[in-house]
Amino acid sequence: MWCFRLSRHFIVYLFSLCAILLLAGCVQSRGGFVSKNHVILAEQNPNTHFEQEVMIVRLSQVLLVGKMSNEERASLHFERGVLYDSLGLWGLARYDFTQALALQPKMASVYNYLGLYLLLEEDYDGALEAFNTVFELDSGYDYTHLNRGLNFYYVGRYHLAQQDFLQFYQADTKDPYRVLWLYLNEQKLKPQEAQTNLVERAKGLSEDFWGTHIVQYYLGHISVEELQQRASEFAENSQQYAEILTETYFYLAKQKLNVGLVDEAAALFKLAMANQVYNFVEYRFAAFELMKLKPVQTEDEKEEKSAVTKAIVF
């Protein structure tokens, strides 16, 4: 098992490295994170996820032989599902979440995850139903405002997205990521006000979040080269650096996409994924944006991808 785990990560690393070398030539930049001969990525350690993998083994053993109530079993399935999700094993995570839901049908957190998976499969109606169910079970479930807002955003219902993003922002006005999604939505909904609102909201942001520096870049207060320098200073370890780069490449890509530079945006979305921070919103939606840039799937293909989840959840 140890040898298999090491080789799997090594193969993924080699594949990512080859892809990244090709991507470097796709992004035109005067410096900073990406140039023709240089791409910045976090160091990939094969043992990064070792603790999560050990926890999965332990939870699996308990689920296999342990005697427990339905509530306890549902909780363990949910916990293992979260671990699978953090490793990018979304099919296995979905299985555990649906098992948890079968045992405890009123777990709001499970509907939140399943709604997110449905959204990423472009099943917007199914995702909306799941997110609405979250609020029926727990009206204070904060992050579902982000997820439902994203659902509205990606179908072009920017007015409804604004309501969710605004409520999400108001719950924590110091969080720059809430400000960034409001800004991205307002660029579509009311572009003449988006920059002014970003300037005003930026005044209350906390320097504890890396995203505050991304906001400063969006405002034109710092260059991409300065953003790169701050990233290396902000990160305390390679895992945090991977998270910072995932976020940065994603929001740089959104900026490129919004001005019509599709090829550069696609390359940056791929770089956002290259740091393998699977459970970050920016990783998930970098993959989603890339899927949307590909030729449109047929309706039959979309329905086939989400049929299993919908059958169990609804």
What kind of feature is each model-predicted range?
Residues 26-79, 299-314:
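N-terminal leader/linker segments that initiate helical-solenoid repeat arrays
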Residues 46-60, 85-91, 119-124, 154-159, ...:
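Helix-turn-helix repeat elements of alpha-solenoid scaffolds
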Residues 65, 69, 103, 136-137, ...:
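Structural marker of alpha-solenoid helical repeat scaffolds
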Residues 70-74, 108-109, 142-143, 175-177, ...:
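Helix-start (N-cap) detector for alpha-helical repeat units in TPR-like alpha-solenoids
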Residues 79, 112-113, 147, 181, ...:
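Canonical tetratricopeptide repeat
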